[in-house]
Amino acid sequence: MAAKDVKFGNDARIKMLEGVNVLADAVKVTLGPKGRNVVLDKSFGAPTITKDGVSVAREIELEDKFQNMGAQMVKEVASQANDAAGDGTTTATVLAQSIIAEGLKAVAAGMNPMDLKRGIDKAVIAAVAALKELSVPCEDTKAIAQVGTISANADATVGNLIAEAMEKVGRDGVITVEEGQALHDELDVVEGMQFDRGYLSPYFINNQEAGSIDLESPFILLVDKKVSNIRELLPALEGVAKASRPLLIIAEDVEGEALATLVVNNMRGIVKVAAVKAPGFGDRRKSMLQDIAVLTAGTVISEEIGLELEKVQLEDLGQAKRITITKENTTIIDGAGEETMIQGRVAQIRQQIEDATSDYDKEKLQERVAKLAGGVAVIKVGAATEVEMKEKKDRVQDALHATRAAVEEGVVAGGGVALIRAASKVAASGLEGDNEEQNVGIRVALRAMESPLRQIVKNAGDEDSVVANNVRAGEGNYGYNAATGVYGDMIAMGILDPTKVTRSALQFAASVAGLMITTEAMITDMPAKDASAMPDMGGMGGMGGMGGMM
């Protein structure tokens, strides 16, 4: 086992704080409307330019192992804030740095670290309750656009695009961000349910120009198995032919004789039909077939529940207003399912989201909710260069997460004002700890809650102490707009922060800061010594006589 280097007490804490400061100082320059960019070197390709706090934090790795431990712990704050709310990473880092610096000063002065931590925790619990009281619901499109604009670093076009996307696909709709081909941003909305399976044969195509299959008011046959025998499909085909309406077959697969016969019937015009594979795999495929059944008021034909394909009636088939099938995708528009059934299914999937443990499962379940509840919107980010594209895409994704958080828990005044108001409320309530050291912990946390406002003002090139005093003297949403240098009502000026983002930033910062304040020893591997130099080759001197070989 390698030898270890151990540091105790103040020696350990000083090294740790040095690491925290390196990371936090690099991250906090990005905060606010006048935050600066950070350039990240990449091992290949062009450097990345970003104003995203968590992207900067993830790049930092320090040579000194003790400093690096401090930096990595604060990196965890940024990552957790990003995972929980999708934004607020820089705010969380600034808060953590402030709590750690003030807390370690108190520890160096001889205070009990455990009591300091308890005081900090008490202050944070009270501040979170105060933030919830200050929060107002974010319901209208204008407020959503404002949140998106602030999170995208005052880019109003991004805020408006996100608000428009949410309006079209609903609060639960899936909104994805992709790299576009144009110079400007675009919004592409897919109404209805879309899944990533295309036609099984190009001979089904009836819209030659678009290379797609368009079915008007079709029946939909949902089958949870492979279909290779045409006899199994005859009852369904005969029923549909009598009704003179098209048919879409969604099955695990349609192959061989069955597919060939469907193609021939379609080309001869006997029955208008198309076939696609069911989306997903295994249990997820069964669930998605059931989703389509609920959406279209159909029944999944499955031998597991005793339904046979040969005995299908027209009543078992789903229906929709229109279906479009391309080489890659199938879109079902305006299914015939009852709204109450669809909402029941959505509620059931939401419950599964709460119970799910893996992020991948949650994401897939969220997609299913969106497909049932509204639709899918794609924001295509436009830019002149690849470097700008990456930077802008990061900002749009941040803004999207922030707007979702705002819809979920409401909004508070932005620009660091909400934290100052929450701190004032806690101070006014006369919150006290069990002893003086806990009171110091409470004061450390409340003082740290001013740090995001101070950093925003510093980045704008103004005097932070003057602005902080002026904001503290005001009431309600009164704050400082760093972009214009004007004081006023932050919400009226459209400067909003999602409550969830502010709350998460404070909770995660206090959590990690509390752990670091109570650290008394740090252990790391000793640096490896260089391998000993190669032994000299003096014993080979006798080879000098080989000169005659030339």
Curated annotation (Swiss-Prot):
Cytoplasm is among the record's keywords: yes
Lineage top rank: taxon: Bacteria
Primary role: Together with its co-chaperonin GroES, plays an essential role in assisting protein folding. The GroEL-GroES system forms a nano-cage that allows encapsulation of the non-native substrate proteins and provides a physical environment optimized to promote and accelerate protein folding.
Subcellular localization(s) per the UniProt record: Cytoplasm
A single GO BP: protein refolding
Cytoplasm keyword on record: yes
EC numbers on record: 5.6.1.7
Keywords: ATP-binding, Chaperone, Cytoplasm, Isomerase, Nucleotide-binding
Amino acids binding ATP: 30-33, 51, 87-91, 415, 481-483, 497
Family: Belongs to the chaperonin (HSP60) family.
Subunit text: Forms a cylinder of 14 subunits composed of two heptameric rings stacked back-to-back. Interacts with the co-chaperonin GroES.
Cross-referenced InterPro entries: Chaperonin_Cpn60_CS (IPR018370), Cpn60/GroEL (IPR001844), Cpn60/GroEL/TCP-1 (IPR002423), GroEL-like_apical_dom_sf (IPR027409), GROEL-like_equatorial_sf (IPR027413), TCP-1-like_intermed_sf (IPR027410)
Enzyme category, top tier: isomerase
Protein name: Chaperonin GroEL
A single Gene Ontology CC term: cytoplasm
Enzymatic reactions: ATP + H2O + a folded polypeptide = ADP + phosphate + an unfolded polypeptide
Entry's Gene Ontology molecular function annotations: ATP binding; ATP-dependent protein folding chaperone; isomerase activity; unfolded protein binding
